[in-house]
């Protein structure tokens, strides 16, 4: 996972998991509303009366209808990342 997405992914995942309604503002000013069904590196699948695939490069702002507790997700991601680095370091030391 790219370092720049270490906040983005857990935040979007918390919005998706908790089914929090969001307003997504595009760079051209259009406001989309719905729930985040899924997302990947390039797009967000927004569910409302229809599903919309929104390209991330077109998004200016994501505004949740209520606050989201993504801190646990970020901490968990950091712990997993740290554990992965420790495993890699151990593997390197064993091959030397």
UniProtKB/Swiss-Prot annotation:
Signal peptide (UniProt feature, chain positions): none
Gene3D superfamilies named in the record: 2.30.30.100
Cellular component terms per the entry's GO annotation: cytosol
Superkingdom of the source species: Bacteria
CDD domains tied to this protein: Hfq
Keywords recorded for this protein, A-Z: RNA-binding, Stress response
Family, similarity comment: Belongs to the Hfq family.
NCBIfam families: Hfq, PRK00395.1
Subunit organization: Homohexamer.
HAMAP family, per database record: Hfq
Protein name, as recorded: RNA-binding protein Hfq
Organism of derivation: Histophilus somni (strain 129Pt)
Primary gene name: hfq
